[in-house]
Amino acid sequence: HRLIRRQRQMCIRDSSCSKDENNNSNNFATGIVELPALRNGANDVFVTHYTTFNGQKVTSFSMEYDKSKKHSRWIAFRFDNQTKQQNVSRSDEPFDADPAIGSQYQRVQADFGKQGYDRGHLCASADRLYSREVNEQTFYYTNMSPQRNKFNTGIWLTLEGQVQSWGRSCTSSDTLYVVKGGTIDKEDQIRGYISNDRSKPIPRYYYMALLFKKGDSFKAIAFWMEHTDSPKSTKLVDYALSIDELEEKTGIDFFPSLNDNLENALEATYSTKAWPGLE
């Protein structure tokens, strides 16, 4: 049985929230850390999918979905000591409509394949291997994005694998917060439209925003990739940027629930040397 929560509005940041001036790791945020600020447009729906794992209700992933574009604005989730587990293999569950959103607002198989695009997972199947049920949820069409095969199986897959490696390094005191998406909001960041249907944009860019709480320390980094058959580089380090720079490109406020001192410090800069395997 799939447990689903639908929610149209959520207060992400409350200006009255207390601030931890010392950036104490036990009081570093005022809300769900991985969630970006919601746009809350007329066609936007916020959804979180859950499963029951080891007798506990566990968040699978969350999204802000734009019904007018039949595409998620972003997908957010976390790796921790529980969700990092690899207990199953990819299910190849039949791709299916997301039961949390009307099927008329979702893409279908005909929008991919012969159109020249893979059904590219945003939350990758390999990101969610701790149970069969959670892996099946990654095959919802709300989690799909039209990706060129060479991109989907090339540099994007390389980045996904690196992020999974970081995520699976988590111990009981660690959490890797992940946001992924494709650009659907700005006309100059749209590659085209499936069958010239403006309700089915093709992202020109894909991105990730990462925040790693490792014990009592924090680090953050972002990645921005053009959606092309011929990547500018095969080195992930060449796609790295700061969270602030990614926010400027996307117009999305990432990790807004962090206390302000920590958010400002983490998002302004990044160190590629701090991320094993990146250099």
Give residue ranges: language-model regions:
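Single conserved hydrophobic/aromatic residue that forms the stacking wall/gate
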Residues: 1-14
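Domain-level detector for secreted/extracellular nuclease and nuclease-toxin modules, and
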Residues: 16-279
